[in-house]
C-alpha cells in the first residue's frame, strides 16, 4: 500500500521522527491538516488570530521577523501557551539559506532564538548538506524538545527556480538525516518510500476563492493539492485577508482539507 493511501494515524506509529509522530497524532485527533500562515506585523494581531484559529489547525506558520513589537516574553511565551491550549505545533518559516555554521547561529541565537520554541523550521538546499548538520547541531545544543526540518523543494510563486535538478538535489540533501528532516515544502509528493522515507509534504498557495495575487502567488484548490500528495495545506490570506472571518474560514478550510484527505485514503 502506498503511503498516500495510509492514514496519518498509521504513519505516526512507524515514523522515525518524534516531531512527525506528534504532528500526525494531533492531526488525527483534531481531524485537521490545516496550517495557518499568519503574516502580520504586531504581536496583538498574531495572538488574536491564533486564538481564533487554534481550535481548527494542526500547525501555525510564523514569520517572526515581521513582528514590529517582538519580544520573547511578550510574543513567544503567549504563542507557546496557545499551542498547548489548542494542541497545535509551531512552524517558523525562516527559510535558512547559508553555510552550516552561520545557520547554526541564526537558529539558536539572536533576539528570536528560534530553536527554543519552533517545533519545525525550514531551509533551502542551495548550500548543501551542511545546512542540515548546522541546524541539527543548534537544536541539540538548545533544547531537549525534538525539532524537525522541512526542505524547500518547490515553491508556489510564478517564475520560481525551485524545480527540476534543483528539486532533485534538495531531495538528496533531505536523505542525509532521516530523523531531523521530516519532509518538504512542495507542490506534490516527493517519493522516497522505496528507500524507507515517509516525508511530510506541506503545500502553500492553497485557496478556495482566489486564483493568485499581483506579486506572483498562484493558488490551487484543496482537492488539487491533497490529490497531488500533500499532507498539510498552508493557508494565509484565505483565512483572514480581505475582511474574512477567521473562525468561519478556518472551519471551512479544515473541513475541505480533511474531506480531501479522507477521499484520498478511501474513507469518504
From Swiss-Prot:
Active-site residues, record numbering mapped to chain: 95
Pathway, per Swiss-Prot/TrEMBL?
Pyrimidine metabolism; UMP biosynthesis via de novo pathway; UMP from orotate: step 2/2
* Positions contributing to substrate binding: 39, 61-63, 93-102, 219, 237
Q: Which GO molecular function annotation, any one, does this entry have?
A: orotate phosphoribosyltransferase activity
Assigned protein family: Belongs to the OMP decarboxylase family.
Q: Which UniProt keywords apply?
A: Decarboxylase, Lyase, Pyrimidine biosynthesis
The name this protein carries in UniProt is: Orotidine 5'-phosphate decarboxylase
**What InterPro entries does the entry give?**
Aldolase_TIM (IPR013785), OMPdecase (IPR014732), OMPdecase_AS (IPR018089), OMPdeCOase_dom (IPR001754), RibuloseP-bd_barrel (IPR011060)
Report whether Repressor shows up as a keyword of the record.
no
Against PANTHER family, the record matches this protein to: OROTATE PHOSPHORIBOSYLTRANSFERASE (PTHR19278), URIDINE 5'-MONOPHOSPHATE SYNTHASE (PTHR19278:SF9)
GO aspect biological process, one term = 'de novo' UMP biosynthetic process
Name the source's superkingdom. Answer: Eukaryota
Keyword Lyase assigned to the entry: answer is: yes
